């Protein structure tokens, strides 16, 4: 469907849980996280009702996120049932891949089309530091398994932070020369824990691109959040997602469902609508989703204000 600004909204990002098995420095605090009661988190059946209703309004792309989505007990069932909705053409997942190796083959059979893997360092000790305890070898094994079963495309999402991992930019880029893997560099955002790092660690996509004159621009879909490039010898693309230096609001085609059941028309807006009160009435749920999508804000003002209006952490909204 179209929002009131004429944008076609066909993409729903679904945070299935706010829980995670890592504690990445820009996403979650190291401690003090209060686990929400199950009654305050959407159940699998409720999530599916929202997905089904959104599909009736023209949503044909679904991405499951977290927290860490593979923690959800019914994630396989959710993917399978979503794949049976005829109008849904693309089912993707963003994961830290710690649990992916043993699950990816069955998830692919269930209907998962592609995965984005959050990976902010290729160095074992640094990865452990950034994630506060993660085992990078589990991620590497998950990538290998995903490649071996033909999961494609596989994209690596890397948040670049000055003085923390920016010395690995070339190493990440070179992955696209060796493997059929895309890499996405994401600008650090002043949201949640990222606010504490932003002033010292933000680095713009433009700064990275300017240092790599051999990058070749690739034609990009209008609704894409990434500007795409590749090297002459690349097997896949290198993307730059630049919410701070080059916002993509004019072509935005997505809304987000949080694990608490609120629908956010914009990641960086305070506005959100609680859908949990409507899931028992299909018509009321459809109407409320329709209304929220139609009233999606024209744009965010994070570039000018240097801060997201969202009061939630990224793990609560969905990465």
Swiss-Prot record:
Residues 4-219 form the Radical SAM core domain. [4Fe-4S] cluster 1 binds at residues 20, 24, 27. It comes from the Bacteria. GTP binds at residues 13, 63, 94, 155, 254-256. It comes from Clostridium botulinum (strain Okra / Type B1). SMART domains: Elp3. Coiled coil: none annotated. It catalyses: GTP + AH2 + S-adenosyl-L-methionine = (8S)-3',8-cyclo-7,8-dihydroguanosine 5'-triphosphate + 5'-deoxyadenosine + L-methionine + A + H(+). [4Fe-4S] cluster 2 binds at residues 249, 252, 266. Catalyzes the cyclization of GTP to (8S)-3',8-cyclo-7,8-dihydroguanosine 5'-triphosphate. This is GTP 3',8-cyclase. Gene3D superfamilies: Aldolase class I. Pathway: Cofactor biosynthesis; molybdopterin biosynthesis. Binds 2 [4Fe-4S] clusters. Binds 1 [4Fe-4S] cluster coordinated with 3 cysteines and an exchangeable S-adenosyl-L-methionine and 1 [4Fe-4S] cluster coordinated with 3 cysteines and the GTP-derived substrate. Disulfide bonds: none annotated. Belongs to the radical SAM superfamily. MoaA family. Keywords: 4Fe-4S, GTP-binding, Iron, Iron-sulfur, Lyase, Metal-binding, Molybdenum cofactor biosynthesis, Nucleotide-binding, S-adenosyl-L-methionine. One of its GO terms (biological process) is Mo-molybdopterin cofactor biosynthetic process. It is an enzyme of class 4 (lyase). S-adenosyl-L-methionine binds at residues 26, 67, 118, 189. Monomer and homodimer. The keyword Metal-binding applies. Its cofactor is [4Fe-4S] cluster. Its EC number is 4.1.99.22. The lineage of its organism: Bacteria, Bacillati, Bacillota, Clostridia, Eubacteriales. SUPFAM superfamilies: Radical SAM enzymes. GO terms for molecular function: 4 iron, 4 sulfur cluster binding; cyclic pyranopterin monophosphate synthase activity; GTP 3',8'-cyclase activity; GTP binding; metal ion binding; S-adenosyl-L-methionine binding.
